From Swiss-Prot:
The keyword Transmembrane does not apply. A motif (JAMM motif) lies at residues 173-186. Keywords: Hydrolase, Metal-binding, Metalloprotease, Protease, Zinc. This is UPF0758 protein PFLU_5982. Belongs to the UPF0758 family. GO terms for molecular function: metal ion binding; metallopeptidase activity. PANTHER family: DNA REPAIR PROTEIN RADC (PTHR30471), UPF0758 PROTEIN YEES-RELATED (PTHR30471:SF3). It comes from Pseudomonas fluorescens (strain SBW25). Gene3D superfamilies: Cytidine Deaminase, domain 2 (3.40.140.10). GO terms for biological process: proteolysis.
């Protein structure tokens, strides 16, 4: 049965307009993005099938173009649309942060860093640079690879902090495995960067680790 033949209250688009996007299931949200189904499958049925094939919404959103295009009902146009939606979401969160103090909106910071880093297949180390009022000046990914071998040079972090004229910063990196447990190397690097940045009077407010679930704050655990 086509979605058009469903009762209005059960159609994903109508439900979204009436109750908001948060009221929809993953399959219903994906169905709105897909717009149409394929022969023998409505958009919702196709969405359910795709979620089962990929193992959930996150793996689908993080899929490579090659893997994405292998699925019936998907293709280069849909992949491009999806990447545009994801990038707009990142930029929206970045814009929100630029207008607020980090200390007043820690959840927004974590949401932003999660959006920036969670989908990356490799470990990325970056910094969120802040002014004296803890407003965001910018974000930069400074290295790629495991923390042990990522070549995170303190002088590089100091150089970028001075370039932004930052008064403080938040360190961050992701664990592609999904684990949120900081390694011994993570803690060692944090202490090393703290000492290097103290010399130029730049405070390290936190080191956020992005994995499965809510990002972990090393500051909240007393590891800073």
């Amino acid at each position: 049965m086509s979605i058009r033949d469903w009762p209005a209250a059960e159609r994903p688009r109508e439900k979204l307009l009436e109750w908001g996007a948060a009221s929809l299931s993953d399959a219903e949200l994906l169905a709105i993005f897909l717009r149409t189904g394929v022969s023998g499958r409505s958009a919702v049925d196709l969405a359910r099938h795709l979620l089962a094939q990929f193992g959930g919404l996150r793996p689908l959103l993080e899929a490579s173009q090659a893997l994405f295009n292998q699925q019936l009902g998907l293709g280069p146009a849909k992949f491009a649309q999806l990447q545009a939606v994801l990038e707009m979401a990142k930029r929206h969160m970045a814009e929100r942060l630029r207008h607020d103090s980090v200390l007043e909106s820690p959840k927004a910071v974590r949401d932003y860093l999660k959006a920036m880093l969670r989908h990356e297949p490799h470990e990325i180390f970056g910094c969120l640079f802040l002014d004296s009022r803890h407003r965001v000046l910018g974000f930069e990914a400074l290295s790629q690879g495991t923390i042990d071998a990522a070549m995170v040079y303190p002088r590089q972090v100091v150089k970028r902090a001075l370039a932004y004229n930052a008064a403080a910063l938040i360190l961050c990196h992701n664990h592609p495995s999904g684990s949120l447990e900081p390694s011994a190397a993570d803690r060692k690097l944090t202490k090393l960067l703290q000492k290097a940045l103290e010399v130029v009077d730049v405070r390290v407010l936190d080191h956020i680790i992005v994995g499965d679930g809510d990002p972990l704050s090393m500051a909240e655990y007393g590891w800073l």
